[in-house]
Amino acid sequence: MEKRNERQVILFPLPLQGCINPMLQLAKILYSRGFSITIIHTRFNAPKSSDHPLFTFLQIRDGLSESQTQSRDLLLQLTLLNNNCQIPFRECLAKLIKPSSDSGTEDRKISCVIDDSGWVFTQSVAESFNLPRFVLCAYKFSFFLGHFLVPQIRREGFLPVPDSEADDLVPEFPPLRKKDLSRIMGTSAQSKPLDAYLLKILDATKPASGIIVMSCKELDHDSLAESNKVFSIPIFPIGPFHIHDVPASSSSLLEPDQSCIPWLDMRETRSVVYVSLGSIASLNESDFLEIACGLRNTNQSFLWVVRPGSVHGRDWIESLPSGFMESLDGKGKIVRWAPQLDVLAHRATGGFLTHNGWNSTLESICEGVPMICLPCKWDQFVNARFISEVWRVGIHLEGRIERREIERAVIRLMVESKGEEIRGRIKVLRDEVRRSVKQGGSSYRSLDELVDRISIIIEPLVPT
């Protein structure tokens, strides 16, 4: 790691692909502004330190068993991580603060701690050392504000939703519709632990020194303007992180299949549908086959990411009908993981069938690639509503996954005039968002304000 005798920032990501990527992107941005970077991380889903030689990486124990790391119950994983990591995190931070001639940190004052909002113990730990703590919001900010209202919405008895009200807007959570609530709020069995967790996040965020948002005013103007209804701390919308003028590097937990790019090179401009449902979502076998048949029936070229184990009860794609790949006549390619930024930036990519995670949504907007929305959980339903109904840069697939609906959406986007209209709108949005990170843009100015704020070094309390 390059020697820097300056201000040090401690970053602590949640060990999920959708959280690690933004945190490492933020690290590169802050490094470019003169800060030394130390990443504290768990053993579970540890980032590859060799991909980031300019940063210091410190691993702490997380106490997860092998079966717990494989669990599909994300709330359970987050609860266990918060229970298990508080003491190891405190011990690691204490070692960084306490001067040590052999640690190499004695001449680097710690400016602050930055961690994901899902860590609910870090505020109290930071306060015990007199360290400022900033919360990273890696969601669209309107969702971040709105999801704290989930317990209230539940208490008000929105569920079950009568059929006559299914398409009504949720007043507290626009542009979400009432029919989205049952999927975003979980089952009744999950309600108590989920509501308790959300309240802990809110309680741990309110006293923080600020919130760093992976969005920009161009995408989150209304919610940013209303943030003072919930928070009295500064908000710094400095996204999208990945298009800031900093060197690119890999932060994927999965190895991307680089053969995607030469395959795309052989395709015509804007002729390929890229399909990926992210790093967490999974499908039952029936839905997987409906997507497969729908894509085949379009007669359009497609590049499809199917993570190993993401189809319930299957290792990979062995449930495809016999002769499926041969029937595509070379128009389809299925990989275990893809270099998504490179794929979306490729001239051959004309559409993105996506789960609408916020990382993927931002990446698609920034490359001007229109979307077909197939949200699976949580914030993805909010993102899909903005894409299809507010910005109108995509098509929302609602209801059950059916091959005819997949086929119809792909044809509309890739062949019909509707797709050209959508493409024109996303190009305008792309240009607005990209301008935000340039000098004088809204995110650039917010980054200047953030750097000024965390440059004020408060002397930490040295543990005895």
UniProtKB/Swiss-Prot annotation:
Top enzyme category: transferase
Regulation affecting activity: Inhibited by olomoucine and 3-isobutyl-1-methylxanthine.
PANTHER family xref list: GLUCOSYL/GLUCURONOSYL TRANSFERASES, UDP-GLYCOSYLTRANSFERASE 76C1
Top-level taxonomic group: Eukaryota
Pfam family, one: UDPGT
Activity sensitivity to pH: Optimum pH is 7.0.
Species assigned in the record: Arabidopsis thaliana (Mouse-ear cress)
Entry keyword Cytoplasm: no
Protein name: UDP-glycosyltransferase 76C1
E.C. code: 2.4.1.-
InterPro entries assigned to the protein according to its UniProt record, in alphabetical order: UDP_glucos_trans
GO molecular function terms attached to this record: cytokinin 7-beta-glucosyltransferase activity; cytokinin 9-beta-glucosyltransferase activity
Family assignment from sequence similarity: Belongs to the UDP-glycosyltransferase family.
Function, as annotated: Involved in the N-glucosylation of cytokinins. Catalyzes the formation of both the 7-N and the 9-N-glucosides.
Keywords: Glycosyltransferase, Transferase
Residues binding UDP-alpha-D-glucose, per UniProt: 279, 338-340, 355-363, 377-380
